[in-house]
A protein has these predicted regions:
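Short amphipathic alpha-helical segments that predominantly mediate membrane engagement
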Residues: 1-72, 84-88
Length: 88
């Protein structure tokens, strides 16, 4: 599948998701009602990265997480997530 998805860095995405997951216990406080949506998107990304498939769906999910994080004001965790995702 390397040639099919050339140019998509699954390892980098996996690393970013691991970093985001370290803050899981803070998601409820920081994201409120969007915490569950965040977790669902993180789980779906993890699944796709593990299978190394559907990079366009992964990018869309990462963008959703970024947008959810941008909507959280005054949160160091959310702004850190936005910064992490700007690398992808």
């Amino acid at each position: 599948s390397q040639s099919v998805n050339q140019g998509f860095d699954y390892a980098e995405v996996a690393e970013i998701i691991q970093k985001i997951k370290k803050y899981d216990s803070f998601l409820d406080d920081e994201y409120g009602e969007n915490a569950l949506e965040m977790r669902n998107k993180i789980d779906e990304i993890e699944d796709l990265v593990q299978k190394e498939e559907n990079p366009s769906r992964i990018k869309a999910l990462l963008n959703d997480i970024k947008n959810l994080s941008i909507g959280v004001t005054g949160s160091l965790i959310a702004s850190g997530i936005v910064t992490l995702l700007s690398r992808v």
